[in-house]
Design a protein with these regions (language model features):
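Short S/T/G/P-rich N-terminal loop/turn motif that feeds into the first structured element of a domain
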Residues: 1-50, 55-66, 70-72, 87-133
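Conserved His + Asp/Glu catalytic blocks
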Residues: 74-84
Length: 133
């Protein structure tokens, strides 16, 4: 969770539309991230707008973040995180700074539930493909 640079709220919605379009064009474009679930939320705290990024993925945290940096670099797309206060300007060449920023802004959950806690997203996709055949 992190504070948005004032006036940048529309950038988040535009960026979300870019991701939706990319996934519509190529459903596997985010595959490297091994995502089960991704959710973005904008909300106000004391008159300031904050961004919450919630992702459930199959890799460990550092690998997920490094893969995200790699994905952005390979596609030439910048990250919407550039619109967050304190986000490192050198994130493209400094993955550890990206990881540190995200860890610093991470909020620990006190309850999590997964219907399939020991099954990867890839295994779920395989099972669904088998069922459909």
């Amino acid at each position: 969770m992190a504070k948005i640079i004032p006036g940048r709220e529309p950038v988040f919605r535009e960026y979300a539309k870019k991701i939706e379009a990319a996934v519509a064009k190529d459903p596997h474009c985010l595959a490297i991230l091994k995502l089960h679930y991704l959710r973005w939320v904008l909300f106000d705290i004391g008159g300031a707008t904050y961004f919450m990024y919630q992702g459930i993925f199959d890799t460990d945290f550092d690998k997920y973040t490094e893969d995200a940096v790699s994905l952005f670099g390979a596609t030439g797309i910048d990250t919407v995180f550039e619109n967050l206060e304190g986000f490192p300007k050198d994130w493209k060449t400094n993955a550890p700074a990206f990881v540190e920023f995200v860890r610093k802004h991470q909020q620990s959950s006190f309850l999590e539930y997964g219907e399939y806690p020991f099954v990867s997203a890839d295994e779920i996709k395989k099972a669904l493909a088998l069922k459909a055949s």
